[in-house]
Amino acid sequence: MKRRDIEDIRRGIRDRDRRLVRLLNDRARLSVEMGRIKADAGLGVFDPVQERRVLDGIASLGEGPLSAEALRNIWREILSASRALQAPLAVACLGPEGSFAHLAALERFGRSTRLAPQVTIGAVFDAVEKRRSDLGVVPLENSVEGPVRTTLERLISTPLAIRGEICLRVSHCLLAKGAGRRIRRVYSHPQALAQCRQWLARHLPEAAPVETESTSAAVLQALGDRQGAAIASRLASEIYGLPAVETGIEDHPANTTRFIVIGTGTNIPTGRDKTSVLFSTQHRPGALHAALAPFASAGINLLRIESHPVRDRMWQYLFFVDLEGHAEDRAVKDSLRSLRRKTAFLKVLGSYPREVEPS
């Protein structure tokens, strides 16, 4: 390619960049105007239903060479910047920076959102309940290790609702200063340690696992331990300067963690929703079958059901159920009404747009 051809292409790119900036600023001005209207109406800037529509619409417009996923990533940052212009949005997440909850929050809200990392899952709930943050991001379940008990326990008592979900493919790295033969302790969150159990047994059989509040907290511990290592994300390695000596050490390559967005308010139906409920039944034979029968009769698909022991009540359980549909859908509303009559306790945790899990 001739030098002149390169310069012609660069001029073409600069011209399109200028036009893009003008259009983005035009869009931003409209977004600011929308923010004023929302504020006058008492509406929040976070609208997961509308954002889903925008991202789906943009992805459908793609004709290449940019993929639908690339377009979603670009517009996610545009939406993040637009929200920041309307009103600052504070999102609490399990931290410190570089944790998988921090990654999930970035994935959902973009880099223009003010993220507020917290030390524990409970602290995330507290930050939103006490209105120090507008929303929170906490892990709910992992495809390999199952539910996160701390999150389930807080959902029982919190006045907050589930406003959205984020499904994040989890890839673990071993971060350390020294060679593997010198590692005597491996720090990480209990779920991360469990997800890498087989790899650790094969490669670091002498190393003792040490539990921490988060994967990023594990990196901070390992930084001060010459014979220590941490299981964390590649982003955590970049943020804290601890080299990733091994990558992809999770036992199951399809390892996915589901996070939920917690906050006040409710979402309107989208036609592709999920509703989460928590309930307990009377302690008698057939009680669970009778409680779930209305959903089968209405043709409502149950996506997930987990039993959760009730503290201080031996052999009594709470059931966490995800079902297809929105709590305002007629069939779901009628089924929930029937469920309430057949249970000792029922709490609708929220209805929200259903995410597609990473393939």
Task: Map each language-model feature to its residues.
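Domain-level signature for soluble enzymes in the chorismate/prephenate branch of the shikimate pathway
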Residues: 1-359
